Amino acid sequence: MKRVLAFDFGASSGRAILAEYDGGALSYREVHRFENCPRESEGHFRWDFSDLMANVRLGIEKAGAFDSIAFDTWGVDFGLLGEDGTLLGDPVHYRDGRTEGMTDEAFRTMNAGALYAATGSQIMPINTLFQLLAVKESDPETWSRAKRLLFMPDLFAHALCGADACETTIASTSQMLDARTGAWSRSVL
């Protein structure tokens, strides 16, 4: 029997679902449910990553043995890692106001039509591209210390097992992937 533990994170709650496949039928059950409570910290609205990871560990404990694990979260948000792989601060929530004015700032370098043509992504102020521009403009110390970016599902995997990868489907929410090649868009970056 194959057992997969999937974590589904929403804006205000999360849950751990254990799916089992016996070769003929698929079944699943919720093994853990928890609140997701973003908070104000360091002048920004942030995800409480330590609390979320504590709930991941609790969900793993409640699930028992499993063959694989997966994380499904909201798009656009990310964690920045330093040289040694540590998180440089709790990830900022997409509802934080730091991206106000960042689309106009970005359009000074690349107009909206060219940006859309390059990425195929709907242009929204919450997109990762504009969040990164906000970090660069308003927090140069963090910007200079950041060596890697991991989107939220990838950040959970990194915290759990040290994996460093940006999975393509979540990266597609960033406004930074080339729509034709699936690689990072050099013209956008």
Predicted regions and their residues:
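Conserved donor sugar-nucleotide recognition element shared by glycan-biosynthetic enzymes
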Residues: 52, 56, 99, 128
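Short, charged, surface-exposed secondary-structure boundary motifs
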Residues: 39-43, 101-105, 176-178
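Residue-level structural signal for beta-strand termini and adjacent loop
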Residues: 32-34, 92-93, 170-171
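Carbohydrate-associated surface elements
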Residues: 96
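Short, surface-exposed amphipathic charged segments that create phosphate/polyanion-binding patches used
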Residues: 46, 106-110
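Short helix-loop capping/hinge motifs at secondary-structure junctions, enriched
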Residues: 86, 101, 141-143
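N-terminal glycine/serine-rich phosphate-binding loop of ATP-dependent small-molecule kinases
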Residues: 1-89, 117, 145
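Gly/Ser/Thr-rich active-site cleft segment
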Residues: 9-11, 116-189
